[in-house]
């Protein structure tokens, strides 16, 4: 393997061993690529990946809940499969009947690996990334796969910037998702990102701290559940702790915890099993 191969391998697996299915998993899930035509992005086709759980093909009348997963920046959708190994977690937990199966959907939230969109609706009408996820991707997945096409069967999660995106999208669309997870996400949009331009009003409209009190009555009524964590030395720890306090003040069900460490892939890998179980336990099943 040459230098380029080593670099590609590291970027794909982040220094961890490649995923390997346990021997007892006789019917692993399948990974599919989906192109979504997105009105929210000016009609462009945007890539997403879908992981269908073990047994999906063998149970043609069964419907499945969906967990939408948003990558960080810089990032790519397949990091959830290659690095976090959520596909193997899905197969392992469902094969041993420790958790119900989920369809995993991983959209690509940018126009390139190093272009930053924060999973939010920007100034340009061709840069409405929150609507891309909550409308275009959700509609495409519901149309093509045997999902539970309601909020009761949908969760949204993300790591790092994707964690911010998951919470921000859920607050903008409080009737679309019943479970919201943030893995080391932040709670304040970055004012230096070009997506929002110089519009302070747009920044405020994408600030979860300001959004939460406005939509809290809807979240309480629907029982939307927030599950999120931060590393003990993560620079976003205080933001997350404050957000947990506000959720408690608003009477919204949630679980927030801190794990030892910083803002690392090791934390996200080690917490992925618990994240999957938290979603699978609360999402409706067909």
List the model feature ranges, each with a label.
Residues 1-286:
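Non-catalytic cap/lid and distal C-terminal segments of serine-dependent acyl enzymes
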